Amino acid sequence: MSKLKTKKYNAVANAEKDASQTFVKGAAILTLSMVIVKVFGLLDKVILTGIFSGVSFEQAVAGGTETVNFASFGLGLYSNAYEIFVVIFTVATGGLPIAISRLVSESTAQKRFNDVKQIHRVSIPFFVIVGILSFAILVGASFIYVQIIESPYSLLGMLCLSPTVLFGCLVSIYRGYYEGQRNMFPTAVSEIIEATIKLFIGAFLAYIIAHLGMNSYAESGTVFGLYIANQTEAYQTIVSFSVAGAIMGITLGSAASFVFYILKFKIQGDGIPEEYYRNSVEARSKRETFNKILKTAIPVAMGSLIMSVGSLIDQVIVQRVLLNMIETNPQALQAQYSKYFTADMFYADTKTIHTSLWGCYSAALTFLQLVTAVTQVFGSSAMPNVTSAWTKGNKDELKKSIETVIRLTMLFTFPMALGMMALSFPIMGLVYNDPLITDVGGRILLIMGVTTIFGAASTPVCSMLQGIGRVDLPMKLYTVCMAVKIGITWMFVSVPEINVQGATVGSMITYAIMTIVGMYLLIKYSKIKPDLFGTTVKPLIGAIASAASAFGAYHLMESIIGSARMSIAVSLAVSIFVAVIVYIAVLLILRFPQ
């Protein structure tokens, strides 16, 4: 009994609280952590952009010299490292944590506490095996993928990232378990640990490696012992090593997150007092439990896999189409980007431009992911509540949970998305301070604002479908939507005047279909009709007013204090402050929420 006294958290008592209270509390905890994580992630990209920009040299041109830097190239390599990783990581961890969360929540609602323990026991060996296999597959796949996208400099970063899939599987053993108990605190802490190490250790390693690489090349003409005759290739090699250092911060962060979970579980136990086990029915057999986990996990994992593979194909198409465009019709891109790339890059060094343009897309994508990450939190927090209400057959609680998720999602998403559209160019200019990224990324972010609305809404909608037991529906929906996305992306990116910006159009249409059809299916199968008008229209009106005020305030400030980087920061701060005040005022006038 002495061990029980060390427990500071009672999972059963928490599960018996009002669903809306636990949802709001869980969402608040995860939202706070996610904001910290995404701010750290944004700072990481800002710092890395500065580091990669520092890897530069002066090149003689007609009438003088110009600086050649590798900021967008470095961001492109950084993004490429994630592409194949995301697919394999999703297969390894995409379905099982959600399955464990749902089954733990369901078993707790049914007071089958021995099943809760059995679920945890059965998941451990399975996750370990999956993690080791996924790590080995990722290492092998990295060598193939760099050949497909013709980006050999991406390989080192991919290899440094590969251990993360193993640690991610080990973390998932505990993350799904705690989330199923409506305890979001461990997830929040572990994510902050990962983000902190990624930011500080990763940036430190990237800087040191870039600094040592440039010194090595200046003194001996070699990069860490490698003789490279061409100066551009030498600096690209330095950037690839620097990117690998930054990615090592991610791997170390995931390892530290796993250590945190191990220590927490050993010190505090599983959160279920011993008397609940004694009074519970006997647990299902390990085989039955394992089959139940797989039955729930496979459709979820397949849906996530389809999304990831679709995105991977999408990314390959974008880069291959851009590369083909450079090789067959360089004049079309040169007319648009001649001030950012030397003539040799369009005709001789053709493997740099498509990676750099992809880096611009990746830079803008960071802001969409900031919003969708928060709404994904709403979906994760809603899952146990929706599952519990559905299991109990409590229609009122289910309706309340669904409406709360929609309301919070729209309340957060609308102002963020429209604000990004209104301030796209100054945001990119301030954050990255690179002419190419500001120009191309600003145009992408402008379109991406609409994409953000549907992308942010689709995740919690699919989570709620899984919560009511229809884990198969998101998978089917993802399959159709990814096919649409690939076709639209190919069509738009192939137009030289649109090029990389076309990837955003495909995403926008895909997420719109996913959200609208997903909501229809949720209403159909839950037999619940949420108040969509009341939960969406008022936040939209407030967001339009706030975005308009932000746009006006920024340009007024710009006309007064100019457009230097510090001036942009001041103008953005003032415009965002004005937008927040206007948004709150409009919501109060409209009495939202009632």
Which residues does each PLM region occupy?
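Interfacial segments at transmembrane-helix termini and the short loops linking adjacent helices
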Residues: 143-161, 403, 420-452, 562-566
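Alpha-helical transmembrane segments of polytopic membrane transporters and translocases
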Residues: 62-66, 74-93, 331-350, 354-375, ...
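Membrane-proximal transmembrane or re-entrant/amphipathic helices at the cytosolic face
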Residues: 2-10, 554-594
